[in-house]
Amino acid sequence: MPTDRDKGPEDRWRPAKGLILGVDLDGVCADFYGRMREIAAEWFETPVESLTEEVTFDLHEWGILTPAHYESLHRFAVTQRDLFKTAGLIPGARKYLRKLSNEGVRIRIITHRLFMHHLHRAAVEQTIDWLDHNGIPYWDLCFVRDKEQVGADVYVEDGPENVKGLRESGCYTICFANSTNRSIGEPRAESWDEVYQLVKRYAATSGAAARRHPAAIMEGGKDEI
């Protein structure tokens, strides 16, 4: 009967194997604010350098003062500039998601991009195109507002209200740091390398993967792209 001594390092017990990682897109994987800044500069006919990179969630720093104003800009960005397809990749996202996937973590992409009426088809198509183009591995793609409903073991999220809501629901949530969430406490990650370390630490200390997904640990799995 094979023993650990007979196995290669990649086959030995990996505490993260079978763990479900719920990952937000905008501000975590996709550089939503960087791309929106470029589009907003075009919208306002102003140099992009005149729009600060230090923004809060509602973007009022750029002169967007009402929900209707935000909706107009957002609709233009999605329908005329393919916002969700053309946003850049946050450094490290692909590298560390693929690394986690190869270690047996099940990547569950969770986004609330369907919050505006009559943009659902564009949002879904652009999202899938972006994920494929950037080589992001995932098992599931969920468009949902109440993210705790998807049942992940660990969440990576940047929206301050989303982080608060997930934590209040008892979900272990890593806050991906940016200017919109400076008031949010630990656990925080300034980079995807830090996300990776926090996920591994959680898996090693909680045993969540072993408790919730014994079949995955026994049989393994591979994320689809």
Predicted regions and their residues:
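Asp-based, Mg2+/Mn2+-dependent phosphohydrolase catalytic module
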Residues: 137, 160-225
